[in-house]
UniProtKB/Swiss-Prot annotation:
Residues 39-53 are annotated as: Framework-2. Residues 61-92 are annotated as: Framework-3. Keywords: Adaptive immunity, Disulfide bond, Immunity, Immunoglobulin. Residues 93-101 are annotated as: Complementarity-determining-3. Residues 54-60 are annotated as: Complementarity-determining-2. One of its GO terms (biological process) is adaptive immune response. Disulfide bonds join C23-C92. The lineage of its organism: Eukaryota, Metazoa, Chordata, Craniata, Vertebrata. PROSITE patterns: IG_LIKE (PS50835). Pfam families: V-set (PF07686). Residues 1-23 are annotated as: Framework-1. Gene3D superfamilies: Immunoglobulins (2.60.40.10). Residues 24-38 are annotated as: Complementarity-determining-1. This is Ig kappa chain V-III region ABPC 22/PC 9245.
């Protein structure tokens, strides 16, 4: 199984500043010219919401403050600038190899 390791596990960012979350895969998630890495936001009592697909593509309706980058084994989610509504837990997920796996999550607090 591909193991996804997120860092940090939690972070506190001041309103209007930048938040950066990293995700490292135990092996490459690249195939056919794409990186099969995705980012989700989850708030308590709600299902995960897709933010970024294929490493860097913004899901429809998601603000451009969210961006993703990376390839092979190292990926980053950036939120810039952070807004109060961004307080949530963020997860990376790969679907390059079955079983599809998630990172352990990063809890974002807004100061």
């Amino acid at each position: 199984n591909i193991v996804l390791t997120q860092s940090p596990a939690s972070l506190a960012v001041s309103l209007g500043q930048r938040a950066t979350i990293s995700c490292r895969a135990s092996e490459s998630v690249d195939s056919y010219g794409n990186s099969f890495m995705h980012w989700y936001q989850q708030k308590p009592g709600q299902p995960p919401k897709l933010l970024i697909y294929l490493a860097s593509n913004l899901e429809s309706g998601v603000p451009a403050r969210f961006s993703g980058s990376g390839s092979r084994t190292d990926f980053t989610l950036t939120i810039d600038p952070v807004e109060a509504d961004d307080a949530a837990t963020y997860y990376c997920q790969q679907n390059n190899e079955d079983p599809y796996t998630f990172g352990g999550g990063t809890k974002l607090e807004i100061k």
